[in-house]
Every structure is written in C-alpha cells, then in structure tokens.
Amino acid sequence: MTAPFRLHAPFAPAGDQPRAITELSSGLHRGDRIQTLLGVTGSGKTMTMANVIADWGRPTLVLSHNKTLAAQLYGELKSFFPNNAVEYFISYYDYYQPEAYVPSSDTYIEKDASINEDIDRLRLRATSSLMERDDVVIVSTVSAIYGLGDPVQYRERMVALSRGQQIARDDILRALVGIQYLRNDVAFERGTFRVRGDTVEILPAYEEQAVRIELWGDEIERISKIDPVTGETIAALERMAIYPAKHFITNRPTIERASMAIRDELATRLAELRMAGKLLEAQRLEQRTQFDLEMLMEIGTCAGIENYSRHISGREAGERPACLLDYFPDDYLVVVDESHVTLPQIRAMYNGDRARKLTLVDYGFRLPSALDNRPLVFDEFMSLVPRLVNVSATPGELELQLSEGVVVEQVIRPTGLLDPVLEVRPVKGQVDDLLHEIRARERRGERVLVTTLTKRMSEDLTDYLQQMGVRVRYMHSDIDAIERMEIVRGLRLGEFDVLVGINLLREGLDMPEVSLVAILDADQEGFLRSDRSLIQTIGRAARNLHGMAILYGDRITGSMQRAIDETTRRRTIQREHNEAHGIVPRGVTKSVDEVRFITRVADARVEREGEAPAPRRLASESAPRSREELETLVGELEIAMREAAVALDFEAAARLRDQLFEVRTALGQAPSEARGNAQAPKRPPGSAPQRRAGGGRRGR
C-alpha cells in the first residue's frame, strides 16, 4: 500500500477553517457516522474538505450534483493532493437516449448512446486505483449509485505479473484476452496488446502509458513502463497488475448459466401475459428475448445486455446491483458537496428509472428482471456509507435530520470578507434603478448577476440593456454545462459585464469579480425565491470586497425575512471577528490564467491543451460571403463540432452539425453529401414502430 495523503496547500487554514477541520476530524475519529458542515460561500469549504480527508487518511468519495461542479472539485482536489490518486468518475456517455415506450402514441424509442473513450479510461482508472492504493479521492456525480461490474470478479480477474515470474508467453496472452483485452499488432490503442517475439506490450484500458513485458523462455526478465507512441522506456518496474478492460466481465459458463435463467423467467412471464389476455405483448416479448438469447449464445453479448444483468451476475430478484461504492474498503469516507441538492437528487434517481422501465415491462418490451438494472434506492445508498460529511451553505431538512441537528459552522472567511450588504427596494422603477447600479459597477470593472422569474422577462431585460449599451449576456435553460462554463469564463474575463438568467449558478461556482446580485420580483414566493435559494443566490456576490445584493419587492415575504436574518447573523459574526482580531477584509483576485484553469471543464479536456476556434456567425446571420470564406467556415464548424462531441456536449455538436449543413448548402453541396450514408437503426424483433424523440439527454 502507498503512503497516506500528503496535502499541498499554498496557505494555512484561516478564519473558521481550523475549528471546522478540528470538529469534523474529531467527529470522524469519535465514530460520528453523519456530520454536516454549514460553510458560507467563499469560506474555503474545499480546503476544509481536503484537510479532513488528509487527516482521515482513507479512500474518500466526493459526490457532486452535476458535471460542472464535479470538474471544478476534481481540479481543486488534484492541486491539493498532487502526489495522491485523485480520480474522476462520471457518466461516460457523450449522448444518452434511454430505451422507452410511449403507450399513448404507440411509440417505441430504442436506446441510443455514444461512449466517450476518455471518460471510460478515467472511470477504469478510478476503480483500479481503489484496488491498488489507500490514498485515493474519487470525485463523482450520481453515476456512483448506478450499476457497475462486481468488484470481487474485477479483482480476481486481475493479471499479476512480476519480474522473475515463471509463466509462458501464451499464458499471458490468454489471460489478457480473458479480461477483454484485444490483440492488435498494428494499431496500439487503449485496451489492446501486441506481441513481438518474446516481448508483449500492453496498453491498459485505464492508463496513458503502456507496459512492456520481456521474457526469457518462460521467465519474465524485465517489466518496463513505456511511451506507447515512441516506445521509449520511462521506468523499470518490479511488478505490474493489469486490471480488466471493462467493468463488466463475462465468460462462457456465465453466459450459459444466465441464458438458462432468462429462459425460465421468459416462460413464467409469457404464461402471465397470456393468462391476462395480453397476446400482442406476449408475442413481442418472446420474439425479442429469443433474439437476445441467440445473440448471447453466439457472440456473448446483445443489444441491451444490461437488462439481463441480474441473471448474468447471479443476483436474486430485487437485490441491488453492485456500484462504485462496493469498490471502496469498509472504512472509507463520503463527502457530499452541495448536499441540499445532491441528496434529494440521489433519492429521486430510483423512482424515475423505475417508472420508465415499468412501462417497458408492462407492454412486453422487457422481462421483469430488467427492473433490477437500476440505481440504488436512498436507503441502500445510506446503508453502504460508513461515514458521511454533508457540505452546504444552506443545509436542508434531510441533512439536519441525518446529523441529528448538529452542524459545524464555517462562517468566517479566511479573507475577512463579510456577507454581501442587503437592500430591499420597490419594484416600481426597478429596471432604471438596476441600470444605474450596473453603470457604477462598469466604472469599477466589476460584474453583475441579474436573476428574474421568467424567460420572457430575462429576454426583454437583456434586449433593453443591450439597447442601453450594456455588455450583457443571457443564460437560458437550453445552454448545457460546457457552454455555461464558457459564459462564466467570459463574464470573469470581462468579455461582458452583466449576466441575466432565471436560475443563475446558485451553487458552487467561484466568481469573485461579481460585486452585485440583483434579484427581481424577490417577493414572489416559490422554489426560486425560497429562503435557501435566496441565500445561495446572494452568495454569488460574497467573494467580492464590495459585495451587495438588491432584492426588488414591494413586500417582505417569509422567505425574504429568513434570508435577510441569516445573512445579517453571518455578517454580525464576521464583523465582530474582524474587529476582535484587527482583520482588514481583502478581495479575491485571480489572474487570467487562473480563471481559464478554474473554468475549464475537466470532463474530457482535462489533459488536452488549447481549444477549438469558436465558429463565426451562422450563415443565416452573416452578410454574403465569398466561396473561400464559406469553405473556411466549414472547416471551423467541423473542428468545433468534433470538440463539442469530445467535451460531452452532444446538443451543441448537433447544432453545429445543422449549421454545417446550412453552410454546405450555401456552397452548393447536397445535404446528403454532408450527412453521409447513415441508415436508420433497425427495429428489434417484435417492436412497435419507432419514432426518434427529438434530442436525447446527456449522460448523468
């Protein structure tokens, strides 16, 4: 096993951080199973988390509710633990359209997905690190509670090689094939190996560097880590463990056993359907399942094989699937970031998944065992968590209940900054008043966030501000995580001064340039104007020395009053601490390079340099162009489209594709030339007519 965590921080804990670190660490060593950290915006919660993780010294899972914040956490924790294994585990889908059936229109939607190879590598690296070391931090989304291969099989099928070991070359090759590695002597890619005489070179599915095994007869003479492109030796190794190329591993006996169980379940289910008079459903189910069984027996897999995972893994009906949490040792730690959002998200996953699959089962598209290919229910998740720290600026009732009302507060910031000044102003004349405040921030080089209640109001306000010469952008619900990060970067770098939206970045993102948050119609009770939402939104200005929040409303609602009272309480604590210790608040400043690093999305570009050039205006928006300009634009759009796909951004890639068709049409190329010869996927046997739903959904 490797050495424990070594924390590298450019500064010592300050403000409330030392007390919070001590209380949380003491609670862990005391045996407190669930704790809650209330950390105000800008108080350095990630720094506190890193210190607690280092003190505990055991593998840790950090959960976030979306990929954007997970990417930010991954980058921050990687900088805190540069010599330890900080890994990233999110959905590996670039694009994911789940299988579904809509009875009202008799529409069957076949599963459609595109897997990102880089993310798949990071997922495999995360689990292999857990098998090898204790100093592991894995940053994950809700993907952590979805089905994964059995960790016992994953460990048992590992191929262990050491210098001086007696083993025949062909035995090594057979072992590699048995864990899903492919021999490819031409293209040396991830998850492949190649053979040159008594030398075997392997590129593990979870690594970027390859391994060279040199034999002398039936003895391993040398093991080296090499560059897969140049073949140059990087380091000599005494031993090497090669873990499977996939999390789900099957063999012939397993497939045969699973096929028998599937046939038994099929016979039982067909009898039930026929007895209920559902003859069409019975015929459909029999045709589809028999087709899948034939594919399983012939090639070892089939479309939708995950729906038979219960039989393949040998689980009982209703038994939960294995997931990432099963790969951790017994004494690991779970940290739930923005727990007021993440915990309810975990709780909601099971019901949504079951509702969709239940329709497939009822109408004969799937066997009932498909329901057991599912995420964990909340109680199962909690039963697998030995120690839990919830982290939020606004803990919800669930966290308070789980931690029995005991909360560790981190209210005082290391910078001495106070919570934003709050003002309540009337609705009448709010836009003119807002414009006056924006002008003042423009002169100081500061930024403004404006949040409204409706899309129409956001659009109208953005148009008005643009007419008044304000550099403003509008963030709407159609913008995905990657574009959102690009907009945040533009705001922080001063490409524009004002960002307008409905539910603007309430949680997590670091924007110290924002000095004013304006909340329009703050007196309208509802989810977007609850006390927790208001506190989170107000917190977007908490990292600026001149932080201020204006709540526009003609009355003070209960939610507004609670948000005002809590902000006032925090400001009082912070001010008294500063006065007692002679602290002068100082603002947070970031260089351009730091802003670019923090706002890059780590999903697939974590180790790539540079970005694709942004495409110019759409053909429909531009003035007439020369043929040369249009051909240049085609190249730009193609590059941007590929980059969007690599960055887990299928929706943007589709929009860029449509723009590409438009420009090619202007060039006189037929759309079919651009689209290629793609054919519609074939319907599974016995399925209803398929109609592709408009737009899939991004992987979790």
Swiss-Prot record:
Can the keyword DNA damage be found in this entry's annotation? Answer: yes
Motif segment (Beta-hairpin): 92-115
Q: Which UniProt keywords apply?
A: ATP-binding, Cytoplasm, DNA damage, DNA excision, DNA repair, Excision nuclease, Helicase, Hydrolase, Nucleotide-binding, SOS response
Give all residue intervals belonging to the UVR domain.
631-666
Please state every residue range assigned to the domain named Helicase ATP-binding: 26-183
**Keyword match DNA repair:** yes
What are this entry's molecular-function GO terms? ATP binding; ATP hydrolysis activity; DNA binding; excinuclease ABC activity; helicase activity
Helicase C-terminal domain: residues covered: 430-596
Q: Which residue ranges are recorded for the region named Disordered?
A: 608-627, 667-700
Positions that bind ATP? G39, V40, T41, G42, S43, G44, K45, T46
**The protein's name:** UvrABC system protein B
Supply the gene name: uvrB
